[in-house]
């Protein structure tokens, strides 16, 4: 009895703490405006808990109580006679009390465990059809996604409850001596015990027959064959075996009911033997033999129709069916006109990688030890009227980095991060450091984008509770040796009262909350401040992307954008991807205000049946994407994580012919890149470019493909991010008969360039580390341009500087073997004429006064380290002037891509050098050093002609 009371105390204490958590969660849901989510979830959990708890109590207590009553009618004793005196000294009244208490405690435990299935319950009763039928049973896929999971849950719990009830009843009968074994093989069972236990065992088999029917449906998710889903063996062998198993299992149940009236063990024994044979041989050994002896030797012939199904349903499940397929000629004849038409693309080539830029941001702009830049995000803004790709990062508060970690500092004083930095992807200072459009504390902006509300109370690492509007002013930001303080003015946080202070002191396990005089009835408490946790609390059924990104709203507020996915592993025939299931949609865009924590959820894919189901379950929770303010709608982007998964599936499932698919004749892979951490797969990258046959530039997410176990490129994938084409994915295939260099091959060619290798070795020997940036393949018109930045960082310092940019391209056919591409010189911008560009001087007007193109002629170039000597410059100038006297010839143009914008930049000594010859195409590589007497440079286009 004492043990039972001990367990009862534990259960009550658990319920108390659970009640505290539920109460504070209710207050939080009220504050964020999603109280309906709380109540629907809570009431459903109570409903499901009651369903499972009552079911367990009724079945378990009813059977054990019945066993206790029936066992008192007769007992076997050693003299082989049935008597009516209980062998236990414990009275029936005490035993009944113990049974009742145990039943209640176990029922509470089952109820708590069962409440976890609330999502399955709601999906079962709110299922949305997919309007797609599986090819085997012709049922809508929604049946397998929404209804089978709850049926399986009911089956498992029914088996558990019946099994526990049967064991408990049998144990009670055994202790009451309702069984007697008479050597050598006779077992006597009291009539009441035999009847009761036979009914329980029969119920177990009847429920087991239902489980066999569920297993019949699970055949759609078989993993035996060459692909996921039922193959030849499952359809022709295992399918009918499972049907037989359903019948045999039901007959087993009937045999135990017959045993009640006919006291012959042979009937249930024979039925059970048949059950074991079908279960072991029919579902295991026999299909394995068919697979090994019949299918494997004739796999492609027998599995072909099932390969077709796997291809079809996998493409549907990952959205590959909607990927547009286009040809990309991969020509090698970029012209001046091509560059002019794609000037915006050239200006937005990203020169800063996330890792070195994050390190540099930390050194230059963290300001204090307790600030931290967690991540760098890519986005696009209209900057002073120009469409630009930028990189930005939030300056968050890092509690672990604070030198004085007291309770007051962590929960009252230091409550928020402050501001963000924003800069172009392609500009640096004269020291090789990133240029900032927005920087410092408080934020200083040099462009028409301003931050008016820089405080960050909710972020990627804000994972602890904090109190605002207290008597103690909050630290806002430092100014020199002094600090500026403030009070929170927003609507975020849960309002407090004395009662709530007591509850939160219990919730957070801190007596200081209750004793602090700084926390008043007008104070507010903020928790669930980490944005991913905040959104997950509101929509736990959404799988969130790990890469949230920051957006500056037109009003100057800082907002977090977070992509949400609906996934399932219940899509028939679809190939699973790691732990993501086998169906995936980017259905939700979450927007979280960094100041007041407001959460808005928008439907980015309203056609998805899974999100439609949850929209029915939680009405009013989601908004249409069209309801997002226009200023924010311009910043939604295709998530890189989703495109990576689609790309990895497309690498195999672009092959729709089952014969080609089976042989993996055209298998693709994601290119691998080299870096400081070794080789790893390339990740998708954003750029601003004009897609082939499109009229204007747009923000695009790119990822190249290579053939499996090869390094040349076979295709590239583009996901469009701007309206009205948001969400459209296009794969551009290269001609199979043409060799197009892949990133790894370009890396190898760069490694073989003597000038670069020499410079890298020199840097690495001087106490510095040369860091190779990510190599980007940028499609321009019908050609590919490769760009790789080089950074230099001191071994003991953490301030990477951009020192070189490597540009690789293929300059067209018709060049003589071994011919070197021509040299050229940079044009200097003329600030007196308001020129914002510098460029390569070539073509008509070169060497003149510039009247032909309205630009100044070349003047003397400054000397310095890495600058060609005067004689070399004279020869370069004469060759450039000679170029202007010859007409352009097709296939004779080459290009470089970097100039200055309002500043000077000079080429590095030996300007270019051909590395190899492939057929009649020269592989050209350019290695640049920047001489920056002014402040910054950027990346517009430059064209150079051969001499």
Task: Show where each model-derived region lies.
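N-terminal membrane topogenic signal
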Residues: 1-6
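Soluble extracytoplasmic regions of secretory-pathway and membrane proteins
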Residues: 8, 12-31, 35-870, 874-893
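Short, low-complexity, charge-dense intrinsically disordered segments
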Residues: 897-943, 947
């Amino acid at each position: 009895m004492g043990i039972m009371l001990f367990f009862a105390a534990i259960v009550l204490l658990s319920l108390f703490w659970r009640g505290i958590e539920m109460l504070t969660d209710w207050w939080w849901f009220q504050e964020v405006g999603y109280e309906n989510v709380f109540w629907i979830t809570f009431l459903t959990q109570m409903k499901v808990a009651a369903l499972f708890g009552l079911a367990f109590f009724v079945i378990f207590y009813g059977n054990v109580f019945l066993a206790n009553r029936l066992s008192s009618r007769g007992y076997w004793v050693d003299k082989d006679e049935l008597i009516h005196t209980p062998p236990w000294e414990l009275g029936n009244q005490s035993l009944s009390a113990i049974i009742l208490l145990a039943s209640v405690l176990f029922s509470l435990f089952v109820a708590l465990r069962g409440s976890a299935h609330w999502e399955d319950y709601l999906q079962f009763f709110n299922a949305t059809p997919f309007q797609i039928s599986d090819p085997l049973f012709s049922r809508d896929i929604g049946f397998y996604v929404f209804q089978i999971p709850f049926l399986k849950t009911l089956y498992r719990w029914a088996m558990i409850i019946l099994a526990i009830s049967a064991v408990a009843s049998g144990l009670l009968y055994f202790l009451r001596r309702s069984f007697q074994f008479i050597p050598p093989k006779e077992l006597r069972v009291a009539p009441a015990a035999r009847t009761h236990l036979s009914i329980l065992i029969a119920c177990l088999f009847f429920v087991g027959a239902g489980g066999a029917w569920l297993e019949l449906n699970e055949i759609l998710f078989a993993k035996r064959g060459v692909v996921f889903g039922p193959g030849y063996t499952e359809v022709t062998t295992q399918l009918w075996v499972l049907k037989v198993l359903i019948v045999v299992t039901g007959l087993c149940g009937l045999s135990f009911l017959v045993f009640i009236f006919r006291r012959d063990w042979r009937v249930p024994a024979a039925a059970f033997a048949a059950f074991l044979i079908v279960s072991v041989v029919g579902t295991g050994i026999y299909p394995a033999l068919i697979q090994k002896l019949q299918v494997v030797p004739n796999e492609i012939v027998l599995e072909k129709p099932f390969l077709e199904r796997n291809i079809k349903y996998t493409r549907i499940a990952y959205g590959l069916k909607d990927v547009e397929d286009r040809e990309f000629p991969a020509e090698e004849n970029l012209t001046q006109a091509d560059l002019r038409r794609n000037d915006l693309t050239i200006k937005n080539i990203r020169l800063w990688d996330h890792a070195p830029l994050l390190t540099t941001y930390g050194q230059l702009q963290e300001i204090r030890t307790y600030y931290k830049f967690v991540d760098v995000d890519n986005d696009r803004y209209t900057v002073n009227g120009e469409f630009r790709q930028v990189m930005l990062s939030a300056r968050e508060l890092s509690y672990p980095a604070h030198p004085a970690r007291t309770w007051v500092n962590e929960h009252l004083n230091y409550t928020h991060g402050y501001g963000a930095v924003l800069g172009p992807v392609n500009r640096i200072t004269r020291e090789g450091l990133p240029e900032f459009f927005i920087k410092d504390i408080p934020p200083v902006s040099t462009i028409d984008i301003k931050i008016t509300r820089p405080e960050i109370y909710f972020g990627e690492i804000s994972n602890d509770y904090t109190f605002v509007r207290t008597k103690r002013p909050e630290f806002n930001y430092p100014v020199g040796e002094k600090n500026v303080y403030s009070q929170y003015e927003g609507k975020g946080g849960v309002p407090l009262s004395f009662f709530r202070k007591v509850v939160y002191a219990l919730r957070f396990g801190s007596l200081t909350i209750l004793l602090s005089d700084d926390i008043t009835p007008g104070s507010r408490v903020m928790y669930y401040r980490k944005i991913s946790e905040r959104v997950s609390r509101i929509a736990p059924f959404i799988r969130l992307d790990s890469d949230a990104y920051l957006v500056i709203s037109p009003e100057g507020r800082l907002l977090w954008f977070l992509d949400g996915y609906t996934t399932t592993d219940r899509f028939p025939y679809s190939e699973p991807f790691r732990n993501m299931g086998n169906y995936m949609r980017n259905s939700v865009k979450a927007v979280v205000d960094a100041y007041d924590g407001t959460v808005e959820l928008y439907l980015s894919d309203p056609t998805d049946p899974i999100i439609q189901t949850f929209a029915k379950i939680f009405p009013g929770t989601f908004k249409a994407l069209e309801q997002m303010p226009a200023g924010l709608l311009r910043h939604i982007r295709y998530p890189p994580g989703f495109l990576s998964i689609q790309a990895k599936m497309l690498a195999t499932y672009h092959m729709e012919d089952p014969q080609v698919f089976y042989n993996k004749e055209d298998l693709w892979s994601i290119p691998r890149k080299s870096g400081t951490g070794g080789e790893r797969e390339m990740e998708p990258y954003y750029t601003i470019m004009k897609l082939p046959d499109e009229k204007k530039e747009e923000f695009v997410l790119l990822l190249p493909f290579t053939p499996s176990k090869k390094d040349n490129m076979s295709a590239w994938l583009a996901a469009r991010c701007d309206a009205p084409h948001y969400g459209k994915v296009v794969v551009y295939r290269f001609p199979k008969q043409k060799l197009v260099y892949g990133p790894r091959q370009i890396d190898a060619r760069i490694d073989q360039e003597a000038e670069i290798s020499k410079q890298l070795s020199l840097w690495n020997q001087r106490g510095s580390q040369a860091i190779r940036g990510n190599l980007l393949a940028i499609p321009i018109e019908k050609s590919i341009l490769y760009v790789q930045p080089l950074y230099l960082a001191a071994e003991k310092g953490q301030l990477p500087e951009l020192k070189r940019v490597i540009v690789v391209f293929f300059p067209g056919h018709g060049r003589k073997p071994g011919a070197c591409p021509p040299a050229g010189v940079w044009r200097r911008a003329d600030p007196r004429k308001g020129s914002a560009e510098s460029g390569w001087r070539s073509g008509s007007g070169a060497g003149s006064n510039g009247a032909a193109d309205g630009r100044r002629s070349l003047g003397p170039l400054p000397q310095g380290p890495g600058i060609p000597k005067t004689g070399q410059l004279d020869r370069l100038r004469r060759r450039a002037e000679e170029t202007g006297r010859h007409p352009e010839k097709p296939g004779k143009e080459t290009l470089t891509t970097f100039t200055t914008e309002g500043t000077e930049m000079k080429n590095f000594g030996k300007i270019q050098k051909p590395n190899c010859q492939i057929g009649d195409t020269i592989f050209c590589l350019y290695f640049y050093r920047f001489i920056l007497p002014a402040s910054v440079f950027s990346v517009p286009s430059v064209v150079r002609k051969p001499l």
